[in-house]
Amino acid sequence: MSRYGLQKLYINGAYTDSTSGDTFDAVNPANGECIAQLQAANAQDVDKAVAAAKQGQPVWAAMTAMERSRILRRAVDILRDRNDELAAIETADTGKPLSETRSVDIVTGADVLEYYAGLIPALEGQQIPLRGSAFVYTRREPLGVVAGIGAWNYPIQIALWKSAPALAAGNAMIFKPSEVTSLTALKLAEIYTEAGLPAGVFNVLTGSGDQVGQMLTEHPGIAKVSFTGGIASGKKVMANAAGSTLKDVTMELGGKSPLIIFADVDLDKAADIAMMANFYSSGQVCTNGTRVFVPQALQAAFEQKIVERVKRIHIGDPSDERVNFGPLVSFQHRDSVMRYIDSGKREGATLLIGGCSLTEGALAHGAYVAPTVFTHCRDDMQIVREEIFGPVMSILSYQSEEEVIRRANDTEYGLAAGVVTQDLNRAHRVIHQLQAGICWINTWGESAPEMPVGGYKHSGVGRENGISTLEHYTQIKSIQVELGSFNSVF
């Protein structure tokens, strides 16, 4: 029997058997063990979830703002009380170190839910005077039933990022987690129900993106889709959403982000920032700054500091709290990352450290890839142009500010960018010219609930987090009121 047993779908406030009974395995990438069997939803299950959501959403929307706020705050409290339990599940399902999942994944997700719970009473319309006897007022009304489709790298955090503003605005959500990492989304559904969310307001359908995800994007009963994933999948989501019922979409589609280091920096600080921008969560972060631009005069010294730090990484069993670098999320993804590493070698990049899968001792049965650093990279190399989503840093040298800005922007992506410098004028001057939606100066990676996150160009549509996201889960109704006489032309 697997550790977490059979996991059913979560529809209408309760665990529900799938129509087909088909299942798939959840695998711990640290050791290859099956930790759960998950039921796979089909079209009938999607219809059931939509019907449940349509029934529950008006009940939820009819509650006062303070009532909805209290229920979501209660869910925040439960999340924090169960932090360690949820972190252990997340670590087993994703391979992320327990030191990460305990301190980041549930914590930051709960923070976002608390943020939106506090904003609910502030969601309001306007009153617009027209003339003495007439005025217009507006209402922000929920969209109805919306869908969230998550990625595998931050399962519960993404589920909370998508559900928090949707629920706060009075919508119901059907959430499809990645089939690779589905367990904590189901636990979140339990928590919402325990907190008092009406049945049907948050449903979880497990299964493949090609099937369940497509059904959700095409379903006529769904008003909006929020998707996190790759560009190719995002294009399908947008096409399906537009081709069915002109659904609204929000999409975060990854990146190939530049981190620009200038010559005036403290090189130790710059190296620390580059390490976090590349190797946190084993490099499986959409905003990672994997194109590290360094002044040519500092390149050798910078490389030395990076190699020193890579050698200090503690790789191992992610359930060991001393470990800060675990396996990749799956064996399939490990193989994909290794193909990119092999490409870097073939195309002539200089390998400084790593460059291999790790198969010795306790790591033999896991999906481990060594932290890898290439230097003397060119802008046309595959490892520089394509999103790898793994622990692979590419170091590129440059000679002038104008040159590095041009090269940093020479990509179809535009999710994130960063600048490390002690010159405040230069920092803002350069950041303002970088084509990216999320930018950091002298830091990397933090995304507070108040901070809108999303990309330029092919990196996405719309934003998550921040006040504006809450508004995007509503539709504006305008009402004109006439207090005086009405004059007809007929």
Curated annotation (Swiss-Prot):
It catalyses: betaine aldehyde + NAD(+) + H2O = glycine betaine + NADH + 2 H(+). Its cofactor is K(+). GO terms for molecular function: betaine-aldehyde dehydrogenase (NAD+) activity; metal ion binding. Its EC number is 1.2.1.8. One of its GO terms (biological process) is glycine betaine biosynthetic process from choline. K(+) 1 binds at residues 93, 180. NAD(+) binds at residues 150-152, 176-179, 230-233, 254, 286, 387. The modification Cysteine sulfenic acid (-SOH) is found at residue 286. Binds 2 potassium ions per subunit. K(+) 2 binds at residues 246, 457, 460. The active site is at residues 162, 252, 286, 464. The record marks 248 as: Seems to be a necessary countercharge to the potassium cations. It is an enzyme of class 1 (oxidoreductase). Keywords: Metal-binding, NAD, NADP, Oxidation, Oxidoreductase, Potassium. Pathway: Amine and polyamine biosynthesis; betaine biosynthesis via choline pathway; betaine from betaine aldehyde: step 1/1. Dimer of dimers. HAMAP family: BADH (MF_00804). Belongs to the aldehyde dehydrogenase family. Involved in the biosynthesis of the osmoprotectant glycine betaine. Catalyzes the irreversible oxidation of betaine aldehyde to the corresponding acid. This is Betaine aldehyde dehydrogenase.
